[in-house]
């Protein structure tokens, strides 16, 4: 037939398969041949829709295509309360503006306007939940007529091919078919018929060939359209280079020192064996086929991506297995050594014995250990047995993840220890482009939305809520003591909060429960949360004696040798758990955050040590003199009679050797704690430098960086390690009181927080609204009092429009400073997120540091920078084009009380260091966007002056407000 007819058929085939199987239009052309799909009937579709007719010219999609893109129901499938009468109403008539994309941000082009009444491309609903059309439009009309018409069509089109070969054939089929009211009603029946026929034997051969791609076809297609189907990368014929997530790499040119090889996932060239493989026969496949089967049958993308990230953090199969074994061995050793020293040693014989065998009690575990202690040991044995069983199942999951990395992503365990996480994201995007086949059709849409932002939101779905929860000061973590309201967060209390709040708010699939979002369920959920706090406090009281004993022994065995060999480390500092939640940005993965925080400790010590402590130094010098004098006298006498004097008892049962050890340790601690006599004193510049790592510089500290008050506030966040350990031990006893008295009073605010901070993203589900950065939120529906309502329409070409439009309504209606701080933190998190993923200099391994920059290219062997001058990598890039912050950010709401106390937009920062603005401190090269929902550089307009003011505001004066 003519060229127009063939183009129409190819276009219709590509559009259909791209939406059903998640494949991209470019991937389908050479992967599926017309003969492979000849068994699927499409008489009704060819006769009633205009998608496969007309000239192949570019056209737009009407704004009325709201029903074409169904909402993926990635949320709770059931309510914890059992009250179904107050479910979110399905007739809210929410209008969603949907723009079909091919996964890389390019719009699909159709020959004519797409019929908008009903489409086969809506997402299938999950079991137990309404479909998108039922939620948005109430219910499908004329269901009985549709069923009758569907049965009638199945009889007529039983043997009709999916894609007819000529116009005459289409006309002939159209004449013999039943006339329907419109083409959209006919198209709505196609997908169900295909699903009903996919297991039939007559279609078995076609199914096996459905995803088979020939080498020759891929070769021709690569040079015709510039995309390598099997290689997973884009190939530019004219420039001879391959495009990656961070830009273009010249073929044969100089390769970046920190970029891993950009190679596509290694997929099977023929996966027909996987089409009919049931789940109970998966392990009969080869490791490569099994890895592909697991990827194709991902049921929960959140859990899968979290496992992918945990595997990356663990540095591969061998390291994770070794770590699990050593942790279990450590637990067994601590329990064994404590029971052995407590029941198997006769300490009364120790002074008169010279051998170990003289003081050991034989068969102590059977004769000395009885009663409660023996019962607890048996409980421990059962616990160890359960850990071994769990380790066995973890080993199977690790094997599957190892195969996924090795065969599909093409990354070995050795490479995993040095490869950047950005490269893992890149490989996942390539894998999604090559094969998005899935057994769970709802996940097709989710897999089509794999990009750095979506992956971070799925991995940190719960952590983002916790970041907002701690930063908005909703939790009362103080002891129920009058006139003592200091919040103390320890790891034990943090674990209980996760168990009581996060474990209750999210279901087993990792999605937030709908009952938390309904106003009608508010009172019930609040009472249930109070009961959980009370129950957790009761369990902590029961377990506290055993936990205290275990952790005392663990900390003693872990830190005693360190303190003995290096007594100066007793005064070492580390960040508290509250500081970690305060400093962490939204969507900031754990390894990026830990690296940033670890690199800040040197500057934090520098800031604290700048403050003079004359009185403390005088006392330390005196103590070191006294202790040093005793050590000198005892050592001198030891030299006179070294054989006898060391065992000489100075006091009862305390020899000379004992006192030499004690006084020596005291002298060492005091000498190491004395501050240097001369040092540079510039706390303002130091804390500004520190804030580039911590992203925390409250407005209240401005102009007071040199004062003792600011230093003490910072020391609460960066405390002495020994004090933190003592607090951890004390919290094992004090945590039950916080769970009983303080946290239950916050239950109402906690439930309100989840309702107000949740927003729905199509294909992603409910996430924390601050973690979305306001990008591509046109389809998002906020949850307010248990009802969905449409967000105001936002301009996706300008980030500031999206952020301000999304949040200014809340800010205008809110008088709380925490709401303003959260929105500022959201914008700041976006800036650092873009810097982490778009700056190629940050594409380094989780344990690596960036190299120093040299302007002279002749320096081929530069030394690594160890003076922390590369700290600017954690500061957002200075190129105005990278951040779409326009003049809207400077519009200060007039009806918000006390806003002037928080804003410094119209005031000059005395510590502004903007003389070198205009170029990024790390890499001035602007990398192309990929799947981040961002367009070009504002149409080429220069807005550097306004953008510079806003960036200075968020980087200097108000960092971490």
From Swiss-Prot:
Membrane topology: Multi-pass membrane protein
An annotated GO BP: piecemeal microautophagy of the nucleus
Ranges of compositional bias, category Polar residues: 203-219, 900-918
Intramembrane segments: 537-557, 722-742
Ranges that cross the membrane: 325-345, 375-395, 618-638, 655-675
Free-text description of this protein's post-translational modifications in UniProt: Phosphorylated by ATG1. ATG1 phosphorylation is required for preautophagosome elongation.
Keyword Transmembrane: yes
Role played: Phospholipid scramblase involved in autophagy and cytoplasm to vacuole transport (Cvt) vesicle formation. Cycles between the preautophagosomal structure/phagophore assembly site (PAS) and the cytoplasmic vesicle pool and supplies membrane for the growing autophagosome. Lipid scramblase activity plays a key role in preautophagosomal structure/phagophore assembly by distributing the phospholipids that arrive through ATG2 from the cytoplasmic to the luminal leaflet of the bilayer, thereby driving autophagosomal membrane expansion. Required for mitophagy.
Record's subunit section: Homotrimer; forms a homotrimer with a central pore that forms a path between the two membrane leaflets.
Name by which UniProt lists this protein: Autophagy-related protein 9
Organism: Vanderwaltozyma polyspora (strain ATCC 22028 / DSM 70294 / BCRC 21397 / CBS 2163 / NBRC 10782 / NRRL Y-8283 / UCD 57-17)
Gene giving rise to this polypeptide: ATG9
